[in-house]
Every structure is written in C-alpha cells, then in structure tokens.
C-alpha cells in the first residue's frame, strides 16, 4: 500500500544550507537543462546548410512572442506555486488542492486564447517584433508549430513548478531532464533527417513537452498525494484566481516587459545592423540565458523555503535563505563575467560558423556583460519579494531594469555609438537596476530584523499573510 505524502515540514526545521542544497540543486539542474533545451534548437538551426544565419535570425525574432507566452504562463503558474508553498506551510491542504485545480483551468483558458489570437495575426506580429522579408519565413515556420502546442507548454511548465513547490524537486528536475534529452534526440531527426528545418525543431519541442505533461497529470491524480487534482478539476474559483494572479503579476510584468523590450531591441538592431545584428543578439541571449537559468535554479530552491517559513512565521530563516542564495548567485555570475569577457569566441562558435555573424556576436557579448557580476543578486532580491507575496515591490523591481532604464538607453546610446550603443545599453541599465534593488532590499532586511519569529508580518505588507 503506498505511503501517503505529507507536507514538507522539513522546510521549517532543517538547516537552511542543507535545504538549499536539496531544493536548489535539482532546480539548478532543471533550469540549466531548460536553457540547454532552448539552446539545442538554436545550435541545430544555426547549422542548417545554406540558411543557418538567416534561420537563427528568424528564430531570434520569435523571442518576444515566446517571452509573451512565458509571461502568461508565469502569471498563472508562479502565483499558484507561491500560494501552494505558503498553504502547505499552514497545513491548509484543502485550499492548496483548489489552487492546483484553478492553475490547470486558467492555463488552459489563457493558453488557448493566446494561440488563437497569435495565429490570426502572426505575420504582422512577427514584422512588428523585427522580422524582415528575409527572416519572416523562418520565424513563421517555427512559431506556427509552437503556437499549436501552446496550451501543452503552459500546462507543462505550470505543473512542473507546482511539483517542485510541493516538496518534490527531484521529480521536477527529472521531468525537465527527460524533456531535454528527448528534444536533443528528436531535433536532428526532424530538422535534418526528415528535412523539416525550423519546423522540425518546433515540432520536437512540442512532442517532448506533451510527454512530460502526461506524466505530470498522472502524478497529480495519484491518491497517495496530499496535493492532487480532484475529479472534474476544470473549475474556477475567482477568489483563488484573483489571489494567484495578483502574486503572479510581478513575474508576468517582468516577462511582458521582456517581450516589449526585445521588440525594441530587435527594431534598433535591424535599423543599425540589419538581420545579422538580430542573429548576433539572438546568440548572445542564448549564452546569457544559460547563466540566468542557473541563478533561477537557485531562486527555485529558495522559493519554497522562503514561502514555507514565511507562512510559518519563521522570519530569521527567510532572511538566512535569501543571504545564502544571493552568495551563490554572485558566484555564478562571476563565471558568467569571465566567460563573456575572456572566452566569447568559444561560446559563439557553438552556434554558428559564419565569420561575419561570429565577429558581431563576440564583440556584442563583451560589450553587453561587464556588469553581470551583480545581476544574480538583483534577480534573487526580486524573487524574494515575489516569494513573500509583496506584489507592488516585485512588480516595480521587475519593470525597473527593462522599461525604466533599458528602453530609453536603447534609443539614446546608438545616437552616439551606432550598433555598439545598442549593446552598451544593457550594462548601464543593469547597474542602475542594482542600485534601485539595493535600496529596496535593504529596507526589507531592516524590517525583518525588527520581527521576532512568530510575530504577525503586518509591517512587511505581504499579500498572502
């Protein structure tokens, strides 16, 4: 007879160092695998004979639309995962199950609406995001397949996040690794053997996510789980949905801002450097994404620990997990800095053999990343506000770097430095965002120092207290 799953009470009692290792390592592996998952498509597409450079530029044009899809997924999924972590800390299993059911229903609705809208206006959207007559075909071929599988993608990432937040990070990691490995196998088969090109890469992606989603649904229908989908789980409780969407608003706006900013970036790159510049920036984004995902893996490990202990009123543990996560994130961004500034040619050569594209990507990588050393800490700080349900602060930090600082610089810097000014806008905005974060996180830590474990968190202003 299977043993009934219990809430992960170790989150409130075990050593923070041990917990962070247990929860962050699977998250790091899963998020690194996720970044490799995206990189695999770019690597194979960049080496398509005769059209690799234009194809990878076309793929880069789809990034804003992919970011917007991700934004809608995080609007639902992150809020639900955060609520479930806190509810498990409070041992409120009934409401946690309702949150899970709401997450599935909302993801289906949002994913379907997004798919229908984008398919109706796909060509104008892609032109708006920076496509040219040369790259539109590749961007359209890729996005059509991705959009047909959009509901699958939303559900896959949403349920994977909840599996991790409910105390099973190894399973979440395993599903991600399985998806990456399967995608690495299917990509060359569909792209080269079947001659499907970029459409083959997209189809492989959707198939892999569908297989992992099927197992995730099975996992949440098992009777031995404290967190499970009830029969007839396609239902919506607006109070729960409102709270979940409120908490997820921060990462939603961050990803939406990323979509808008990427559109501005592509338009400026096309203006000052043409399709080649968009392809170069696409390669740089894939390289940066690898290191960002490692930091996000630490964030994923921190989130259930911070959320549970906040729900249990153990504020000293919340502060400790934040400080430890910040330290490790800074170490990771140190490696990111070294790779960008001293070994750019090694990183870029993975994606393309085109000499002109390689030269522009290598120069751009050096210009974009001199301030990344402090970016990891800034990401962890933003994640802490999100994990504690501090919606307004999370939203502001999510938007400050991209909209408040980066967008104006994208239009100002090229006036003086041409295409290099577009790349130089990134480190300047990173530095300004980190100063803003320092002020806000310092204020939060001072408030934590005034709270004793067990006190009501009124002074913190959390939406889920």
Model-inferred region functions:
Residues 36-39, 47, 53, 87-90, ...:
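Helix-loop interface residues and adjacent transmembrane-helix termini in multi-pass membrane transporters
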Residues 25, 41, 80, 121-122, ...:
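Hydrophobic/aromatic residues in alpha-helical transmembrane segments
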Residues 68, 183-188, 213-217, 289-293, ...:
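Hydrophobic transmembrane alpha-helices of multi-pass small-molecule transporters
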């Amino acid at each position: 007879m299977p043993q009934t799953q219990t809430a992960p009470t170790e989150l409130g009692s075990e050593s923070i160092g041990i917990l962070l290792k247990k929860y962050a390592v699977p998250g790091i592996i899963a998020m690194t695998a996720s970044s490799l998952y995206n990189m695999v498509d770019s690597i194979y597409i960049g080496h398509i004979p005769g059209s690799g450079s234009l194809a990878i530029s076309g793929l880069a044009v789809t990034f804003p639309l992919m970011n917007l899809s991700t934004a809608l997924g995080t609007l639902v999924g992150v809020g639900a995962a955060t609520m479930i972590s806190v509810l498990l800390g409070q041992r409120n299993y009934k409401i946690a199950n309702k949150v899970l059911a709401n997450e599935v229903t909302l993801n289906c609705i949002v994913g379907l609406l997004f798919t229908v809208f984008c398919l109706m206006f796909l060509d104008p959207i892609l032109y708006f995001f920076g496509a040219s007559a040369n790259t539109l075909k590749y961007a359209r071929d890729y996005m059509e397949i991705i959009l047909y599988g959009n509901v699958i993608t939303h559900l896959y990432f949403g349920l994977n996040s909840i599996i991790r937040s409910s105390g099973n990070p190894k399973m979440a990691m395993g599903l991600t690794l399985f998806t990456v490995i399967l995608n690495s196998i299917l990509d060359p088969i569909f792209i080269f053997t079947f001659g499907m090109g970029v459409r083959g890469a997209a189809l492989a992606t959707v198939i892999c996510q569908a297989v992992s989603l099927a197992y995730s649904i099975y996992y949440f229908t098992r009777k031995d789980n404290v967190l499970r989908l009830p029969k007839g789980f396609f239902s919506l409780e607006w109070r729960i949905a409102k709270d979940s969407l409120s908490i997820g608003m921060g990462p939603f706006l961050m990803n939406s801002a990323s979509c808008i900013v990427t559109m501005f970036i592509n338009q400026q790159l096309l203006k000052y450097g043409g399709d080649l510049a968009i392809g170069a920036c696409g390669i740089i984004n894939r390289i940066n994404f690898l290191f960002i995902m490692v930091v996000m893996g630490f964030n994923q490990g921190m989130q259930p620990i911070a959320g549970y202990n906040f729900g249990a009123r153990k504020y000293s543990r919340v502060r400790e997990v934040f400080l430890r996560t910040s330290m490790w994130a800074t170490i990771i961004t140190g490696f990111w800095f070294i790779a960008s500034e001293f070994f750019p040619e090694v990183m870029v050569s993975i994606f393309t053999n085109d000499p002109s594209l390689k030269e522009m990507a290598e120069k751009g990588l050096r210009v974009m990343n001199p301030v990344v050393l402090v970016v990891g800490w800034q990401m962890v700080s933003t994640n802490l506000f999100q994990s504690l349900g501090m919606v307004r602060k999370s939203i502001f930090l999510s938007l400050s770097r991209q909209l408040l600082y980066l967008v104006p610089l994208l239009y100002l810097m090229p006036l003086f430095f041409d295409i290099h000014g577009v790349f130089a806008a990134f480190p300047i905005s990173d530095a300004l965002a980190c100063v803003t974060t320092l002020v806000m996180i310092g204020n939060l830590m001072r408030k934590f120092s005034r709270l004793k474990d067990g006190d009501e968190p009124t002074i913190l202003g959390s939406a889920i207290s």
